[in-house]
Amino acid sequence: MIRNIILDMGNVLLDYNPEVILEKTLDNEEDRQIIRRELFGGPEWVQGDLGIIKNSERFDGVSQRVPSRLHPALKECVENWDICMVPVEGAVDFCREIKARGYGMYVLSNACNLFYEYFPKYFPFGSYRN
């Protein structure tokens, strides 16, 4: 008998698209490419997802690799990247249904320390640790 459902966050519950914050923050494709590569493709992104560093520490490392003229945009991307997360179509309804049927729901995913702040905005079903 199945009692619990385990879900991943990325591309299962939420689509992650860094272009959202890059296009909102930067007008120039060359500048977007720099921040895309150094922030979202850099080691600090992985370290944050692994819990090695906090989201607030990402700026410190990445800022050393981007021109200082881009630091305000970089800071904006670091602080507001969660707007890149959009629920996968049907995911919210699916989660409501499994909770209503009494299943335990667990989310296992590599995510930074801000997970408990941004995830409930999209999936407000209470604890994900049952």
Named regions from a protein language model:
Residues 20-21, 43, 57, 61, ...:
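Alpha-helical elements of Rossmann-like donor-binding domains used by nucleotide-donor carbohydrate transfer enzymes
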Residues 110:
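Cofactor-binding loop segments of dinucleotide-utilizing enzymes, especially the Rossmann-like FAD-
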Residues 8-11, 51, 98, 107:
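Generic structural signal for small/hydrophobic residues in well-ordered secondary structure
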Residues 35, 44-48, 95:
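Generic hydrophobic alpha-helical segments
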Residues 1-41, 64-65:
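Active-site neighborhood of HAD-like aspartate-dependent phosphohydrolases
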Residues 45-77:
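A metal-dependent, Asp-based hydrolase signature
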Residues 113-130:
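Substrate-recognition "cap/lid" segment bordering the active-site pocket of phosphatases
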Residues 71-106:
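Short, acidic loop-to-helix structural element flanking the phosphoryl-transfer center
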